[in-house]
């Protein structure tokens, strides 16, 4: 019975620290130092949330740049169902999915002169990726330009404006945030 009191007091002390003080401290510091990131990197237009800079959206019209396929096929870009397709490279089902995606992209982008960029036909590990390379965005320019009556030069400049360079040049590659790029396209129409 003599060991019960120190064990109970240690338990209560650690419960207070790990269940109360630590979460409150990290939340307060996150809100203070990184308020935009701590709140989900939400993209707002006035009082309306248009999306998150961290999660892709299902842009399907010809007037929008398309991102990577979502692995959450039933409800595209659903963060609650996040996860990869888990299909191995040797799996025939993956080959069928990629072939179907290539055919759909070729049909939607008949003026594209090069091969379909790989990230437009393969899902990311999370299935929610919001970034593609500037080259994959540029591949879609003819379709978007035709649908929106914009010039190739305008869209090339827009892609360059929304391209983000890697933090360290030799690690990673430039990317374009599809959500931000498509919202900028919508603003051009206003």
UniProtKB/Swiss-Prot annotation:
Protein's membrane topology: Single-pass membrane protein
Keyword Isomerase applies: no
GO CC term (a single one): plasma membrane
Record keyword Transmembrane helix present: yes
Subcellular location: Cell inner membrane
InterPro entries per the UniProt record, alphabetical: KdpC
Record organism: Escherichia coli O81 (strain ED1a)
Protein name: Potassium-transporting ATPase KdpC subunit
Keywords: ATP-binding, Cell inner membrane, Cell membrane, Ion transport, Membrane, Nucleotide-binding, Potassium, Potassium transport, Transmembrane, Transmembrane helix, Transport
One Gene Ontology term of the molecular function aspect: P-type potassium transmembrane transporter activity
Family according to the record: Belongs to the KdpC family.
HAMAP family: KdpC
Spans through the membrane: 10-30
Cited function: Part of the high-affinity ATP-driven potassium transport (or Kdp) system, which catalyzes the hydrolysis of ATP coupled with the electrogenic transport of potassium into the cytoplasm. This subunit acts as a catalytic chaperone that increases the ATP-binding affinity of the ATP-hydrolyzing subunit KdpB by the formation of a transient KdpB/KdpC/ATP ternary complex.
PANTHER family per record: POTASSIUM-TRANSPORTING ATPASE C CHAIN, POTASSIUM-TRANSPORTING ATPASE KDPC SUBUNIT
Subunit architecture: The system is composed of three essential subunits: KdpA, KdpB and KdpC.
């Amino acid at each position: 019975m003599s060991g019960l009191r120190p064990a109970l007091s240690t338990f209560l002390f650690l419960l207070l620290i790990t269940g109360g003080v630590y979460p409150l401290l990290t939340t307060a510091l996150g809100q203070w130092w990184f308020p935009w990131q701590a709140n989900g990197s939400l993209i707002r237009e006035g009082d309306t949330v248009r999306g998150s800079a961290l999660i892709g959206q299902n842009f399907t019209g010809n007037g929008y740049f398309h991102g990577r396929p979502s692995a959450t096929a039933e409800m595209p870009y659903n963060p609650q169902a996040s996860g990869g397709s888990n299909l191995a490279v040797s799996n025939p089902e993956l080959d069928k999915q990629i072939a179907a995606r290539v055919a759909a992209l070729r049909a939607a982008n008949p003026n594209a002169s090069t091969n379909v960029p790989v990230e437009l036909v393969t899902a990311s590990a999370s299935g929610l990726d919001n970034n593609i390379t500037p080259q994959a965005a540029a591949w879609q320019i003819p379709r978007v330009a035709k649908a929106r009556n914009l010039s190739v030069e305008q869209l090339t400049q827009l892609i360059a404006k929304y391209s983000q360079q890697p933090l360290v040049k030799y690690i990673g590659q430039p990317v374009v945030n599809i959500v931000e790029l498509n919202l900028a396209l919508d603003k051009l129409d206003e």
